């Protein structure tokens, strides 16, 4: 609590009707004779308790708008309140700016690794090749060999026993039934026909020369038939 305050019992009147409060400290000895009087005003002025320098309005009365060392009235209270609110607003603004800066820095820290990953160039030899699906990356990479299950091989052998050449529609049906691609069915049948030709040629050579000629003619017919079938599929 401040030691300076306005005491109505210590005011004195001037000729113009204005009250003038002398700037005297609370612990001053000049207040001691006046503290026990109930009256104030003209009687206090007649007693002349204070010396003449304290009655000079030019020296003691503050007319400027700036706050003096003893200006503790209502205006100063509101000024302090406004200053306190401004300080709080500045503090809140500083806190929000700090939080925004932290969020921005964290976002930059997150996006930096992603940018680094995107900027890394991946070459074909760095990618992994799937040997089971037969899908490889790069033109110079050798495709992996497809591994067929026992059930798939059995169904394909049955189909090959009845039809050595498949139409596109039948190939799609078998691929959907065996969970394979159309290309895998086509490659399997091509390989199976080549194997069948070799087996037929081998049996013909073992049986005799005449049989070998007939086997060769049959092999040539099979090759021509295969070529025509592939041309039809391309069309």
Swiss-Prot record:
Keywords attached to this entry: Developmental protein, DNA-binding, Homeobox, Nucleus, Transcription, Transcription regulation
Pfam families recorded: Homeodomain
InterPro entries: Antp_homeobox, HD, HD_metazoa, Homeobox_Antennapedia_CS, Homeobox_CS, Homeodomain-like_sf
Compositional bias (Basic and acidic residues): 219-235
GO terms of molecular function: DNA-binding transcription factor activity, RNA polymerase II-specific; RNA polymerase II cis-regulatory region sequence-specific DNA binding
Stretches for region Disordered: 200-235
Protein's cellular compartments: Nucleus
PANTHER family assigned to the protein according to its UniProt record, in alphabetical order: HOMEOBOX PROTEIN HOX, HOMEOBOX PROTEIN HOX-C6
Family (UniProt): Belongs to the Antp homeobox family.
Protein name: Homeobox protein Hox-C6
Organism: Homo sapiens
